[in-house]
Amino acid sequence: TALKRVIDMAGFVGSPLVRIMTPKKEQILWGLNGAEKWNVAHGAWDAQLPLLSPAIDVAKQAGIVLAVETGNGTMVNSNYTGRRLIDDLDAKDNLKVLWDPANNCWCHETAFPDGYNEVKDGYLGHIHIKDVKVDTPRATLEVRQMGEGQLDEQFRLLANALRTDNYNGVVSFESVYHTGNGNFEDGFRLCIDRFKAIFGK
């Protein structure tokens, strides 16, 4: 299978993690006080569990950890849903959250303290960082230069918490910004010093 091939590649390069994504997102998964009757996408969450369970078994056999990314168009689009997936699959040893705080902005999960508190107790596998400005009502996402998006102050608080809590995983920079000219290398160079200043040792 494709997953087994990727796990083999991870072993070859010495990666302890393999990234996975969950299926396309339904907007409302749970509800109360009438919403459970009229608004919830019934069965959408539970339907993904038997789809993902075999992947957990493959990871266990291979001795590797899967990292489910918080994607803005996926069923796991927040650290809350990432943690819930891990708990529902009883897979904390072989499934972690690959946290993209910028993606979580789309569902309005505040990176710090809310997002961090969901995953800090053994659920966090990897973090990758970019800065953004989201406008959910207009269905618009803008990647911003580090420090010019909506996450700058939260990044500082998060970095301090990671140091305080002795996080020993990787925090990587996701280089997806350009100034409008399509040149991602220039965008990288405009962002990397600020990234290192915040998240470096």
Show the residue positions of the predicted features.
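C-terminal helical cap(s) of enzyme catalytic domains, especially alpha/beta-barrels
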Residues: G182-K201
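Hydrophobic alpha-helical membrane-association signature
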Residues: A2, Q48-L51, Q154, G187, ...
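Conserved, mostly hydrophobic/aromatic
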Residues: A10, L66, G82, D100, ...
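Active-site acidic/histidine proton-transfer and metal-coordination neighborhood
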Residues: T1-V97
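Residues that line or immediately flank small-molecule/substrate-binding pockets and catalytic motifs
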Residues: T22-K25, D131, E174-S175
